Regions:
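Peripheral, non-catalytic segments flanking oxidoreductase cores
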Residues: 1-161
Length: 161
C-alpha cells in the first residue's frame, strides 16, 4: 500500500538502511539526503554538458549502434512502454571505456566512480534487508554484481527548451 508523502531519508541516521529499503517497498523509490555524491560536481557536470548539447560537437559523438555509447539526439530518443510517441529528450551514454568529449571526461569519470561506490552501498542495504529465501537465490552479493561491469553506464540527459 502506498502512502501520500515520500519520506526524506538522511544517510547519517542510524536506521537509514532500513528506511531506504522500506521506502523502496512502499513507494518504489527513495529520497536520500546527506549522501556521498558531490553536488557541486553534479551542477558543474550539468553546466558543462549544457554547452555540449548546445554545440555541433554532438555530431562528432553520434551513438554507436554496437556499443550504445555516445550522443542520442531527439530523433533517436526512446518511447515510453506502450507509446508510439518518442520522448522529447536528447542524451549521452557514457561508459568509462567508451567515447566522450575529452574536456568532459575527467569530471564525468570521477562522478561515475563515486556513483558506482554509492550504488554498491545501496545494493548492500537491499541485500541486508532481503528475506533469506530471496538471498539464497543470489549468485553473488548484490553489491558485487556491478564490480568490473562493462554494462554500467551513466546517462547524461538533456530536455531541450
Amino acid at each position: 500500500m502506498t502512502k501520500n508523502t515520500l519520506p526524506t531519508i538522511s544517510m547519517l541516521s542510524k536506521d537509514s538502511d532500513q528506511a531506504f529499503v522500506r521506502s523502496l517497498h512502499e513507494y518504489g523509490f527513495a529520497a536520500l539526503t546527506d549522501h556521498p555524491l558531490d553536488m557541486i560536481r553534479v551542477h558543474q557536470i550539468y553546466d558543462d554538458w549544457q554547452v555540449f548539447f548546445d554545440s555541433k560537437a554532438t555530431f562528432q559523438f553520434q551513438f554507436n549502434k554496437d556499443t550504445q555509447d555516445g550522443y542520442f539526439g531527439l530523433a533517436d530518443a526512446e518511447s515510453a512502454k506502450g507509446s508510439a510517441v518518442q520522448d522529447f529528450k536528447e542524451y549521452f551514454h557514457f561508459y568509462p571505456a567508451g567515447r566522450c568529449p575529452s574536456d568532459l571526461r575527467a569530471n564525468l569519470l570521477t562522478y561515475y566512480h563515486a556513483a558506482e561506490a554509492f550504488a554498491k552501498t545501496l545494493l548492500a542495504w537491499v541485500e541486508r534487508h532481503s528475506p533469506t529465501d530471496i538471498c539464497d537465490g543470489y549468485l553473488e552479493p548484490l553489491s558485487s554484481m556491478i564490480d568490473a561491469s562493462q554494462s554500467s553506464l551513466l546517462r547524461i540527459l538533456h530536455y531541450p527548451t
